Amino acid sequence: MKISKEEVAYVAHLARLEFSESEMETFTFQMNEILLYMDKLNEVDTSGVEPLSHAIALHNAFREDKVQESLSQDLSLANAPDPRGEFFRVPKVID
């Protein structure tokens, strides 16, 4: 499978990206290289390989839930640029 410059331009348009002509050629080449690599991977015989979700076995490593000293309110607010009493004041993000 080969990707054309027009297909890269179409995907860029969908993503609302603008590329110069040289960038378009670079991305077209890179996408085609990725697809060639994927074709090579598809040719590999994996019939005896068990499917995995991770390359190595993962085990949950939980720490014991212990009560311990935490950061005091004064220390946590010490570097706040504009604390409001005992709270962090942040810019409004929703109108």
From Swiss-Prot:
It holds the Pfam family GatC. GO terms for biological process: glutaminyl-tRNAGln biosynthesis via transamidation; regulation of translational fidelity; translation. It catalyses: L-glutamyl-tRNA(Gln) + L-glutamine + ATP + H2O = L-glutaminyl-tRNA(Gln) + L-glutamate + ADP + phosphate + H(+); L-aspartyl-tRNA(Asn) + L-glutamine + ATP + H2O = L-asparaginyl-tRNA(Asn) + L-glutamate + ADP + phosphate + 2 H(+). InterPro entries: Asp/Glu-ADT_sf_sub_c, GatC. Keywords: ATP-binding, Ligase, Nucleotide-binding, Protein biosynthesis. One of its GO terms (molecular function) is ATP binding. The keyword ATP-binding applies. Its EC number is 6.3.5.-. Transmembrane segments: none annotated. Heterotrimer of A, B and C subunits. Belongs to the GatC family. Allows the formation of correctly charged Asn-tRNA(Asn) or Gln-tRNA(Gln) through the transamidation of misacylated Asp-tRNA(Asn) or Glu-tRNA(Gln) in organisms which lack either or both of asparaginyl-tRNA or glutaminyl-tRNA synthetases. The reaction takes place in the presence of glutamine and ATP through an activated phospho-Asp-tRNA(Asn) or phospho-Glu-tRNA(Gln). PANTHER family: GLUTAMYL-TRNA(GLN) AMIDOTRANSFERASE SUBUNIT C, MITOCHONDRIAL. This is Aspartyl/glutamyl-tRNA(Asn/Gln) amidotransferase subunit C.
